[in-house]
A protein has these predicted regions:
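N-terminal structured subdomain of primase-like DNA metabolism proteins
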Residues: 1-110
Length: 110
């Protein structure tokens, strides 16, 4: 009996993450977010919780590849990596918000 090798496609999440952070403007503009970049940090109102009026309520660190909501701690619910940020924004728009949904959304953009 002959053994057949199965070709599997794998997705390197670190590579996807790197692509996102190399051109994060694409993602932020897709969500219609207003933001300000100061050095290696991006600041904006939190797009996840309602009533966010603090223009520096969320920071995204381009060197740490992580985000944080300083107003209500939304990162505690969703996680701090960029895929979690996407999940949170999708959730706030009443869209599906599983990891696979976030990954699919990002892959369509890049």
């Amino acid at each position: 009996m002959r053994s057949e090798s199965v070709s599997k496609k794998t997705l390197d999440l670190n590579k996807v993450r790197s692509i996102i952070f190399d051109d994060i403007d694409v993602l932020l503009e897709d969500f219609g977010l207003e933001y300000e970049q100061v050095a290696d940090n991006i600041f904006m109102r939190c797009p996840i919780h309602e009533g966010s009026d603090n223009p520096q309520g969320v920071s995204i660190s381009l060197t740490k590849n992580a985000w944080r909501c300083w107003t209500r701690g939304c990162h505690d619910e969703f996680g701090t990596d960029i895929f979690s940020f996407v999940r949170g924004v999708l959730y706030s728009k009443d869209e599906p918000y599983q990891f696979s949904d976030a990954l699919r959304h990002v892959c369509k953009l890049y």
